[in-house]
Amino acid sequence: MNDSLKAQCVAEFLGTGLFLFFGIGCLCALKLAGASLGLWEICIIWGLGISLAVYLTAGISGAHLNPAVTIALWLFAAFPGRKVLPFCVAQLAGAFGGAVLAYFLYSNLFIDFESAHNMVRGSAESLQLASIFSTYPAAALNI
């Protein structure tokens, strides 16, 4: 791996991490700290996160910030195949890094929220907090 590719992968890692840190941090504040954020504010914060990430990484790596974007660009011959795997690995690692950082900063509030609401991790009730990091169908929906 040459220095240019390393720099691009570091940019993708940091950009993806920054993007998800902003968004997940916003959702943590909403659900755990009682922040009174409406849909408008949440969208603005996510938008600010992606805008900063794109601004910081576009000149270095092209600001893909998502494996789906990298793979789509490769499939349509706008991105070299030898960079796909390193970019995707960097993006996935950055996503986990951003999520872990947000979890670490709010970890005490996670524990307090679980205690106050008698939640057991892995139970159906815990999906309320798990939905900060991922999406799940509503419990009332059936297939």
PLM ranges: what are they?
Residues 1-143:
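Membrane-interface helix-loop junctions and terminal tails of multi-pass membrane proteins
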